[in-house]
């Protein structure tokens, strides 16, 4: 009788241990961290690695007048709609597939898009950065659960812009077509490449 009780205890203990081991396995931990951690420290650390991500446009793309004006509302002292501005865009691995999907992309949680805002096409020194982070469901469902951030030219300060409604209103028209991501730079890049092919 005692042996049967001991055997049951051993079986139950093994079962519980297997569940715990599975839950805390390295594979499971890898899938939930650090890519889906949104505390300011880990998020900043990921953003600062953006140069190792996929470069979306091979060359800086000239911003449209609409985009320049929208960004001017965020950083008026630097960006002016009266001067040409260029952007260079990077996307992390989580958002890469959605970025290049032709129709109705859905960016997964943890996707990050970094835009370098350049004063000239040949500039290597961005004057500031705008950032989109796809947050967890329910973070801001009205605006597609995207978090909008800016980063100064020194990369030392990452924060939400004071006039965040400017970012939200700029991206709102793209909610049904590309999950609030304009991807205008992809189309501009494509037209530039087509022109180069025709000229050859």
Language-model regions: role of each:
Residues 31-103:
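N-terminal secretory signal peptides
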Residues 26-33, 37, 52-63, 99-200:
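Sequence context surrounding c-type heme c attachment/ligation sites in exported
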Residues 9, 17, 66, 162-165:
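Disulfide-bonded cysteine motifs in exported proteins
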Residues 2-10:
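Bacterial N-terminal signal peptides that target proteins for export
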Residues 20-21:
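C-terminal motif of bacterial Sec signal peptides marking the signal peptidase cleavage site
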């Amino acid at each position: 009788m005692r042996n049967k009780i001991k055997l049951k205890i051993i079986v139950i203990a093994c079962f519980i241990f297997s569940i715990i081991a599975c839950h805390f396995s390295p594979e499971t931990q890898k899938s939930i961290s650090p890519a889906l951690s949104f505390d300011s420290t880990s998020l900043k650390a990921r953003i600062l690695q953006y140069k190792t991500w996929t470069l979306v446009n091979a060359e800086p793309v000239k911003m449209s007048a609409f985009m320049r004006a929208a960004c001017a509302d965020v950083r008026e002292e630097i960006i002016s709609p009266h001067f040409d501005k260029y952007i260079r865009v990077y996307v992390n691995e989580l958002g890469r597939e959605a970025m290049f999907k032709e129709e109705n992309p859905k960016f997964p949680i943890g996707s990050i898009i970094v835009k370098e805002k350049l004063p000239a096409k040949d500039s290597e020194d961005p004057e500031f950065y705008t950032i989109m982070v796809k947050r967890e469901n329910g973070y801001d469902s009205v605006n597609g659960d995207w978090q909008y951030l800016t980063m100064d030219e020194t990369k030392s300060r990452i924060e939400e812009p004071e006039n965040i409604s400017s970012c939200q209103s700029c991206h709102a028209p793209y909610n049904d077509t590309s999950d609030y991501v304009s991807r205008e730079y992809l189309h501009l890049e494509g037209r530039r490449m087509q022109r180069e092919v025709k000229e050859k």
